[in-house]
């Protein structure tokens, strides 16, 4: 399973037998399509939650302003946030980054 984009804090650690398999992602991004969104919310997220270094999992809808962020808490539970207002910001807390949804979706939604 490979995400659409990844952020790694620190030095990337790769699986010995597979150079393209990252062991220590901090943030994973998936760009949703109608045919993949259930898979990304279900089986894929279940698998990703097992990665101890993962702090945030971001799902980006391609048909409307809608981003879902799951964040690992200190007790290892996950907190869920939805953002759908174009004037709102997507915050990636792991790297102290924020972007307005309107900018994220520029040239995607007309």
What are these language model-derived features?
Residues 1-51, 59-110:
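C-terminal interaction segment
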């Amino acid at each position: 399973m490979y995400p659409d984009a990844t952020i790694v804090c620190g030095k990337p650690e790769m699986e010995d037998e597979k150079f393209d398999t990252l062991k220590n992602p901090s943030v994973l991004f998936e760009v949703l399509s109608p045919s993949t969104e259930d898979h990304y919310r279900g089986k894929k997220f279940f698998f990703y939650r097992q990665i101890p270094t993962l702090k945030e999992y971001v799902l980006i809808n391609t048909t409307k302003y809608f981003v879902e962020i799951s964040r690992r808490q200190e007790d290892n539970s996950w907190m869920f946030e939805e953002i759908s207002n174009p004037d709102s910001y997507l915050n990636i807390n792991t790297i102290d980054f924020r972007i307005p949804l309107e900018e994220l979706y520029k040239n995607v939604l007309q």
